[in-house]
């Protein structure tokens, strides 16, 4: 379909207003603007399909990550990289993606992004090792950042002001449905192991959706680009990408390498490069050149506070979501499906919280409702950590549901208001750019959260392993003695158990069994069974303790977010039809 055909109203289905001549008079006799795009609602379905693909790609990985590592091998940092790879590329390239759409055409960039994203999903599904999967995830994130920003511009282009709110309102149910069903479908696919695909089928979900989105985009989306061709800040792009990479890489890899000097050198270098990025942007602004970020926005203290709240808040909640999924599967031994169903109340009540905010809380209470959402979320996290700490190995899904549900409700209230309040002091003509930067910071928070909280959690697993064995040593000795083990044999087995648990938590190859663990398997059958029970108890205790301590850090980050939120505007932006 040509651009001319795409822009011509379909007279059989178009509303009367769409059939008026472009330059003809309106109902009041004044000149009417161009008619709205006739296929706009069908085109909106294409844009929603792309959003769902992006959402699924994030939610399914939390469920599939343990199975990926078990199959491909590698250290625990593999789990971090297959998540960080996507979010880091998405965060860095998100603003650039919008600029490319303005320059080369939104439809063209949407189609290129959708084709590339779908192809990258297939690459993920056939990855032969963790390195290939991580590279494919980086590619996915970059192409997602090219595809997703075009939707905002296309919606503004296709819909008249009176329909814009309804168009954006369609995102809520679509995203809510994807958030609820995504993990459940992923858990089922991993457990079902259809045709021997296992976790690989999780990435193949995007194939039929991607094909439908691509075909729909070609047939339904209108052409369009910015009236004025924007400039592109290549140097700024290179600086921010290299700076963030230099910071994130040692955060993820430093722990398993024993925090060598090069890790700290790289982090210092990354910080220096980011300072250089700010200096470059200031210089470009003085010269009237292209900038990656509108620095005038950062001078608005309340908007800058919104960026700070988003960074700290999403650092806490994104890392928590991944680690909870790992704790359920690796720590407690839940199947992927059971883990996904256990976490479903999070998504369900998140949607409920967002609906409540949009219907009542946001307009009536403003920033107070946002603060309330943070308190409810922190309460849910507190309930979770107390439940995990008290129950340890005997934990059931139903015991976790109250904390997860309360946390999800608070999360929904918070994110339902954050963007509207953070953008309240931004001028109308700057809203698109400001929203793009805020979304990029949100994705950066996802990246930092997985890197920092993941490193903390995995570090705790190694450092407290010995204490976890010692906590259950008395019971283990009783069971070993009943199995016929002598005192000397008990001492040796417990010593090997301490080393085994520590090495299992910090080993760089999941396919290799540490020597200390093999020693445990060489005992007599009755003794080996008692030792295995002791290992499972210590293993679960180790994960539970690490999870509890990490959740305290999450609560601390929520407290920081609560304090920073006092700098936000008291009320959200009033809808003005843009």
UniProtKB/Swiss-Prot annotation:
UniProt xrefs under PANTHER family: ACTINORHODIN TRANSPORTER-RELATED, MAJOR FACILITATOR SUPERFAMILY MULTIDRUG TRANSPORTER MFSC
UniProt family annotation: Belongs to the major facilitator superfamily. EmrB family.
Region (Disordered): 1-33
Transmembrane region(s): 78-98, 109-129, 135-155, 170-190, 202-222, 232-252, 259-279, 306-326, 341-361, 369-389, 444-464, 546-566
Main location: membrane
Annotated compartments: Cell membrane
Name by which UniProt lists this protein: Probable actinorhodin transporter
A biological process from GO: response to antibiotic
Domain of life: Bacteria
Keywords tagged on the record: Antibiotic resistance, Cell membrane, Membrane, Transmembrane, Transmembrane helix, Transport
Bilayer topology annotation: Multi-pass membrane protein
GO terms of molecular function: transmembrane transporter activity
Lineage: Bacteria, Bacillati, Actinomycetota, Actinomycetes, Kitasatosporales
One Gene Ontology cellular component annotation held by this UniProt entry: plasma membrane
InterPro entries: MFS, MFS_dom, MFS_trans_sf
Functional description taken from the UniProt entry: Promotes the efflux of actinorhodin.
Source species of the chain: Streptomyces coelicolor (strain ATCC BAA-471 / A3(2) / M145)
């Amino acid at each position: 379909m040509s651009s001319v055909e795409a822009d011509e109203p379909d007279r059989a289905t178009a509303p009367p207003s769409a059939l008026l001549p472009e330059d003809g008079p309106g109902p009041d006799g004044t000149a009417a603007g161009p008619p709205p795009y006739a296929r706009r609602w069908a085109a909106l379905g294409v844009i929603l399909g792309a959003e769902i693909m992006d959402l699924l790609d994030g939610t399914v990985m939390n469920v599939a990550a343990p199975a990926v590592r078990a199959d491909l091998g590698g250290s625990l940092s593999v789990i971090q990289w297959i998540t960080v790879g996507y979010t880091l590329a998405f965060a860095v390239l998100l603003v650039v993606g919008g600029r490319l759409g303005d320059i080369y055409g939104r439809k063209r960039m949407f189609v290129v992004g959708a084709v590339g994203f779908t192809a990258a999903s297939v690459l993920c599904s056939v990855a032969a090792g963790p390195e290939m999967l991580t590279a494919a995830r980086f590619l996915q994130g970059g192409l997602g950042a090219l595809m997703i920003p075009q939707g905002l511009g296309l919606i503004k282009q296709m819909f008249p002001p009176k329909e814009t709110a309804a168009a954006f309102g369609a995102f809520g149910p679509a995203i809510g449905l994807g958030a609820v069903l995504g993990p459940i479908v992923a858990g089922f696919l991993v457990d079902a192991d259809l045709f021997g695909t296992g976790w690989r089928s999780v990435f193949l979900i995007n194939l039929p959706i991607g094909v439908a989105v691509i075909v729909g985009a070609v047939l339904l989306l209108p052409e369009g680009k910015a009236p004025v061709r924007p400039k592109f800040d290549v140097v700024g792009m290179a600086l921010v990408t290299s700076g963030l990479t230099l910071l994130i890489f040692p955060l993820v890899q430093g722990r398993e390498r024993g925090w060598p000097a090069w890790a700290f050198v790289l982090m210092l270098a990354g910080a220096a490069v980011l300072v250089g990025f700010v200096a470059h942007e200031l210089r470009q602004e003085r010269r009237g050149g292209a900038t990656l970020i509108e620095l005038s926005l950062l001078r608005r203290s309340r908007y800058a506070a919104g960026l700070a709240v988003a960074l700290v808040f999403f650092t806490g909640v994104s890392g928590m979501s991944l680690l909870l999924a790992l704790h359920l599967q690796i720590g407690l031994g839940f199947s992927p499906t059971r883990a996904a169903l256990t976490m479903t109340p999070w998504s369900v009540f998140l949607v409920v919280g967002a609906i409540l905010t949009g219907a009542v809380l946001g307009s009536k209470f403003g920033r107070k409702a946002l603060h309330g959402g943070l308190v409810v979320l922190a309460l849910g996290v507190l309930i979770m950590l107390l439940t995990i700490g008290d129950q340890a190995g005997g934990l059931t899904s139903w015991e976790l549901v109250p904390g997860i549900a309360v946390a999800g409700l608070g999360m929904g209230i918070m994110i339902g208001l954050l963007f509207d309040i953070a953008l309240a002091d931004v001028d109308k003509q700057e809203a698109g750019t400001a929203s793009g930067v805020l979304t990029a910071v949100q994705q950066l928070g996802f990246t930092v959260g997985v890197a920092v909280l993941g490193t903390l959690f995995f570090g705790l697993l190694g450092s407290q392993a010995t204490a976890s064995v010692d906590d259950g040593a008395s019971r283990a000795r009783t069971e070993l003695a009943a199995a016929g083990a002598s005192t000397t044999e008990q001492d040796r087995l417990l010593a090997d158990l301490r080393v085994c648990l520590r090495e299992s938590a910090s080993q760089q190859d999941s396919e290799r069994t540490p020597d200390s663990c093999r020693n445990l398997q060489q005992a007599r059958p009755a003794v080996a069974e008692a030792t295995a029970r002791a290992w499972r108890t210590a293993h679960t205790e180790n994960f539970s303790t690490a999870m509890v301590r990490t959740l305290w850090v999450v609560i601390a980050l929520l407290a920081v977010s609560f304090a920073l939120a006092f700098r936000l505007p008291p009320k959200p932006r009033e809808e003005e039809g843009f």
